[in-house]
Amino acid sequence: MRKLTILGATGSIGSSTLAVAAQNPQLFEVVALAAGTNSQKMLELCRIWKPKYAAMASLQAAKELSVLLEKHEISTQVLAGDAGLCQVAALDEIDTVMAAIVGAAGLLPTMAGVKAGKRILLANKEALVMSGQMFIDACEQYGAELLPVDSEHNAIFQCLPADIQRAMGRCDLEEYGISKILLTGSGGPFRYTDIAELASVTPQMAIAHPNWSMGPKISVDSATMMNKGLEYIEARWLFNASREQLQVIIHPQSVIHSMVQYKDGSVLAQMGLPDMQTPIACAMSYPDRVDAGVAPLDFSKIGEFTFLPPDYSRYPCLKLAIDACYDGQAATTALNAANEIAVAAFLNNDIGFTDIAIINEQILNSANMATLVDLESVIELDMQARVLAHNIIRKVA
């Protein structure tokens, strides 16, 4: 039986992880849950799952949760702050960490799980975007097992030889006859919208993704295709891929989740309904297969597959991310920080939809791109880029 800590338990990935665990109670035990500020949702989860520990990033939320648990006579121990999140990721009594905290906030607790030698189910793409080679090196140094959860990276993972699956970040694609990884994306809700109309897109329009059910931040990232840009960076590190070995292609139906092209002309694709419980179940049970609670794919109802090259004039954030990926670790760290601030400002109606890419580019051009040597320098640059982004937003808001 796998014993789990779920980082980001109250979010979309956390909910899907718990759904898979509920589908297979004989295989998974939830030992610890962690979240940010939603103490009421965490109370509900504690009532259902009765974890030994619950960690809240917000000190105030941790206090609220303690009061609520005592009131409902639930014995779950409450931990608080970054230290609490890191503690539940490194518990002796767990072997698996679902790393699903959105954004830079997930880096430290995910790295705590790595340093404790856990099996890391990586849904927090920002951890690799921010720390890249440091993260891969830490997995090797501490004996952590890294399994991708993002639907695209999990799809690629499933199409790769077993030797590569066991050596995430340290493989040689050329050695195994792999010529290219094809990273698919739906193109978001505005792939056919007139480019001139994108400036008037509202937050409500941006979070209405046509295929996937996701949180607001990731939905906006999907609309700008920054999400695909971050996934591109993550794929570069997970699969040790060169620029020539990675290609983004738009596939509006979201049925083929990604593909791997081999030297002999073969292309392996992973397909399924757009439901995160499938890649989550794959990572949770690897190398076995379990019931994910997802309906099987009915090919007679799909109709057709469509593939399009990305239009960078429509998706400038995607181009920024691809370029930053090979400009060095500092560039991707700064871009991720700027994008988090810009998306939050857009969701708060402080800036327009097309301003997100403008702010991201300005940060890439103005942040101090010194060499990052450790996590402290990563976090320092992350904070610097956020301050710069806030200052730019104040001027345009």
From Swiss-Prot:
Recorded catalytic activity of this chain's protein: 2-C-methyl-D-erythritol 4-phosphate + NADP(+) = 1-deoxy-D-xylulose 5-phosphate + NADPH + H(+)
List cystine links: none
**Keywords of this protein's UniProt record, alphabetized?**
Isoprene biosynthesis, Manganese, Metal-binding, NADP, Oxidoreductase
Where along the chain is Mn(2+) bound? Answer: D150, E152, E231
UniProt EC number: 1.1.1.267
| Positions of NADPH binding | T10, G11, S12, I13, G36, N38, N124, E126, G215
Q: Which Pfam families match?
A: DXP_redisom_C (PF08436), DXP_reductoisom (PF02670), DXPR_C (PF13288)
> Which Gene3D superfamilies does this one have?
1.10.1740.10, NAD(P)-binding Rossmann-like Domain
Q: What biological process terms from GO does the record include?
A: isopentenyl diphosphate biosynthetic process, methylerythritol 4-phosphate pathway involved in terpenoid biosynthetic process
Binding annotation for 1-deoxy-D-xylulose 5-phosphate: K125, S151, E152, S186, H209, S222, N227, K228, E231
Q: Any idea which GO molecular function terms this record carries?
A: 1-deoxy-D-xylulose-5-phosphate reductoisomerase activity; manganese ion binding; NADPH binding
Q: Which cofactor does it need?
A: Mg(2+); Mn(2+)
In terms of domain of life, where is this protein from?
Bacteria
Question: What top-tier enzyme class does this entry carry?
Answer: oxidoreductase
Pathway listed: Isoprenoid biosynthesis; isopentenyl diphosphate biosynthesis via DXP pathway; isopentenyl diphosphate from 1-deoxy-D-xylulose 5-phosphate: step 1/6
By sequence similarity, the record places it as follows: Belongs to the DXR family.
Enumerate the HAMAP family for this protein: DXP_reductoisom (MF_00183)
Which function does this protein serve?
Catalyzes the NADPH-dependent rearrangement and reduction of 1-deoxy-D-xylulose-5-phosphate (DXP) to 2-C-methyl-D-erythritol 4-phosphate (MEP).
- Put simply, this protein is called 1-deoxy-D-xylulose 5-phosphate reductoisomerase
Q: Which organism is it from?
A: Photobacterium profundum (strain SS9)
Corresponding gene? dxr
